[in-house]
């Protein structure tokens, strides 16, 4: 059995990282760490758990190329140590594998990660015994066409966005749904979000919160310069096409907050719901409404 561990590289996360590695090794499982953790020298050299794993030959620090090859071999679980950003990076590393993903919260909010550091022993036990539930979340994908040729494919858990590259500039975008133009706007950007991503960038830009099991896609303009450019909620089987009409090329394509590609005027971005779900592992019971109240510190009394 193999466990994939993603580490945010912060000093506060190192003891948790070492403890999880040691717990996993004690149960005769091997550990694969992401390149971000591999490049953290203090994480490699100061944690006794990590050193003993190296000596035992069960802990492998891999470069990106080796990591990609290792992903082809199944993992029993993926564990991130950090905030939502670390969890999303792990999800990208393990995309299309069906690996159950767990997150230990070392961030400020950690909406996607629900394991506290003091619960890591129970977490490893739950993984070993298979005592957890799985939530299957559909990702969003995008294909970029330039001059009639596909130049890039993208994938995200939360959202894919088109944004301005330079402050003070606006982005001109046409939005088509099933071939029908529904928006022609100037804005700071536009968000194509999943139900999972409805509590992230989409929410901060005025989009609605939707329950993660809902099969919908959100189209949310960011600071639009039109009076009636409002968020749209679509069934997840709709075809969404974005066309960049900005006269300059100060536009970028981002996925889950990371810049992936510089766009040009005339580029077309076709967005679809992914076919292979992202599997969220859950060891805690609770409903989504309770999670909202806790994470957003909502005043309910």
From Swiss-Prot:
Show the GO cellular component annotation of the record: cytoplasm
Known catalytic reactions: NAD(+) + ATP = ADP + NADP(+) + H(+)
Query: Per the annotation, which location comes first and is thus the protein's main one?
Result: cytoplasm
- Please state what class of enzyme this protein is: transferase
Cite the Pfam families for this sequence: NAD_kinase (PF01513), NAD_kinase_C (PF20143)
- Residues the entry annotates as binding NAD(+): 84-85, 89, 158-159, 169, 188, 199-204, 258
Q: Which UniProt keywords apply?
A: ATP-binding, Cytoplasm, Kinase, NAD, NADP, Nucleotide-binding, Transferase
Q: Which biological process terms from the Gene Ontology are attached to this UniProt entry?
A: NAD metabolic process; NADP biosynthetic process
**Subcellular localization:** Cytoplasm
Q: What is its EC number?
A: 2.7.1.23
Report the active site residues. 84
Q: Name one GO molecular function term.
A: metal ion binding
At the top level of its lineage, which domain of life is listed? Answer: Bacteria
Cofactor(s) annotated in UniProt: a divalent metal cation
Q: Does the keyword S-adenosyl-L-methionine apply?
A: no
**Database matches in HAMAP family:** NAD_kinase (MF_00361)
User: Could you tell me what this protein does?
Assistant: Involved in the regulation of the intracellular balance of NAD and NADP, and is a key enzyme in the biosynthesis of NADP. Catalyzes specifically the phosphorylation on 2'-hydroxyl of the adenosine moiety of NAD to yield NADP.
Q: Which family does it belong to?
A: Belongs to the NAD kinase family.
**What name appears for this protein in its UniProt entry?**
NAD kinase
């Amino acid at each position: 059995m193999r466990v994939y561990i993603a580490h945010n590289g912060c000093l506060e996360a190192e003891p948790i990282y070492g403890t999880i590695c040691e717990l996993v090794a004690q149960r005769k499982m091997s550990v694969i760490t992401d390149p971000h953790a591999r490049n953290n020298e203090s994480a490699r050299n100061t944690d006794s758990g990590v050193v003993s794993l190296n000596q035992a030959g069960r802990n492998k620090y891999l470069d990106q190329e080796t990591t990609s090859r290792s992903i082809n071999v199944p993992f029993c679980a993926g564990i991130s140590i950090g905030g939502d950003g670390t969890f999303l990076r792990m999800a990208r590393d393990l995309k299309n594998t069906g690996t159950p993903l767990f997150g230990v919260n070392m961030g400020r909010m950690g909406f996607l990660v629900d394991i506290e550091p003091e619960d890591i022993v129970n977490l490893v036990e739950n993984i070993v015994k298979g005592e957890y539930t799985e939530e299957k979340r559909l990702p969003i994908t995008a294909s970029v066409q330039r001059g009639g040729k596909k130049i890039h494919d993208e994938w995200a858990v939360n959202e894919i966005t088109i944004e301005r590259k330079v402050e003070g500039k606006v982005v001109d975008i046409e939005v088509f749904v099933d071939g029908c133009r529904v928006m022609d706007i100037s804005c700071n950007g536009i968000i194509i979000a999943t139900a999972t991503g409805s509590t992230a960038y989409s929410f901060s830009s005025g989009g609605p919160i939707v329950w993660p099991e809902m099969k919908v896609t959100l189209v949310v303009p960011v600071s639009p310069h039109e009076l009636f450019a409002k968020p749209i909620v679509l069934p997840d089987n709709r075809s969404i096409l974005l066309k960049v009409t900005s006269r300059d090329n100060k536009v970028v394509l981002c996925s889950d907050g990371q810049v992936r590609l510089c766009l040009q005027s005339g580029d077309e971005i076709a967005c679809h719901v992914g076919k292979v779900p992202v599997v969220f592992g859950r060891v805690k019971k609770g409903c989504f409404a309770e999670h909202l109240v806790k994470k957003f510190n909502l005043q309910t009394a």
